[in-house]
Swiss-Prot record:
GO molecular function: small ribosomal subunit rRNA binding; structural constituent of ribosome
Presence of the UniProt keyword Iron in the record: no
UniProt protein name: Small ribosomal subunit protein bS6
InterPro entries cross-referenced by the UniProt entry: Ribosomal_bS6 (IPR000529), Ribosomal_bS6_sf (IPR035980), Ribosomal_S6_plastid/chlpt (IPR020814), Transl_elong_EF1B/ribsomal_bS6 (IPR014717)
Amino acid sequence: MQRTYEVMFIVRPDLTDEDLDKLVSTLETQVGTAGGTIKSVDKMGKRRLAYEVSTFTDGMYILFTIEGEGALIKEVERRLRVQEQVIKFITVRVDEEQKRLAKVKAIRDTKVRGKGTRAAEQAAAAEAAAPAAAPAEPASAEPAPAV
């Protein structure tokens, strides 16, 4: 079953642009020959790392959006693991995230609809109670006697 994955990896900051392009094209070729498709490649540039990784404080971020089988992703991760230029990587299955967000949105919409219905019912009850609470006799114009 084809699923969508995001693979983000960080490469050494001292890597040249040619070496980075070579690494990216190697991974693209590997994904293509394994039967997967690359939806997008986003080179996010050089950024500071949150903590030191392998004596590096900066890294160049690359984000792949891949559609393919789990075995393909396993092979991509294996290749990233053995590359000396790659200092960190993470893979996320996007379709699971989309399902979770859809579920949260459905729950939120249900709650909003429930609140809207409840508010409408309360307003209708208040309008119905308002005429009943009004006095039946008009107030007299004469002031009440002082005691």
